Amino acid sequence: MGCMSNPTNPLSETQWAAIDKRILRADEDRWISSRYAGASERRALIALYALAYELARVRLVVTEEGLGLIRFQWWRDAVSEIEAGKVREHDVAKALKEEIDAGRLKPGALHKLIDGYQGAFEAEDRSLEPEAWLALTAANVLTPIHDWAEEIRDVAPYFSAARRSDSKAFGPILTPAPKPIRPAIAHFRLRKFYIEGKTPNPLQKRLSVLQAIRSGKV
């Protein structure tokens, strides 16, 4: 998937824009929420979501479990090498290195994310995908201290199940989310569309996320 590159070469604006567009196509919900983060934090969120995209799509691009495990190990090794000051020749790996070096992403959190997606892949059960951990990691990019971890753990599985059309359960009614973490979780509000079997159009998504950003109600 890629070899070592010069770790001193940062991604260009064009390369960052390409990753950003990739997330817009692959995960518009989270992408919309991330627009409300500050510029530096937004890049960290996009790097995080780009890793999640690479991990989530393993089940779609391999035909054998062993090949999937190789891909998960590739990303596990890529994060470990970043900790050692090296980086692989892959735009997402380079993005992760920049954000790890800046202190906005933590290698331990990324390893846990990889483990979670691998566990879901091996079990052939998407309900085990680490949606809550992904949201918690995103929230911690925005602020290291908040009192909404339990709420994120509670609501994330309902959002993801509804978005996959696996469940029509709305899940918990929550108190408003703290303002600093809203760009990490505002898209959870879209569950109200998904439980009704609706596919909101881009404008509906943006308005719903904006309401969540303003009110904290997801």
What residue spans do the PLM features occupy?
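Acidic, metal/ion-handling microdomains and their immediate structural contexts
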Residues: V79
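Membrane-interfacial hairpin junctions
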Residues: I145-D147
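Catalytic cores of Mg2+-dependent Asp-rich isoprenoid enzymes
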Residues: G2-R76, G85-K97, L110-L113, P130-N140, ...
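Hydrophobic alpha-helical segments and helix pairs
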Residues: A93-S127
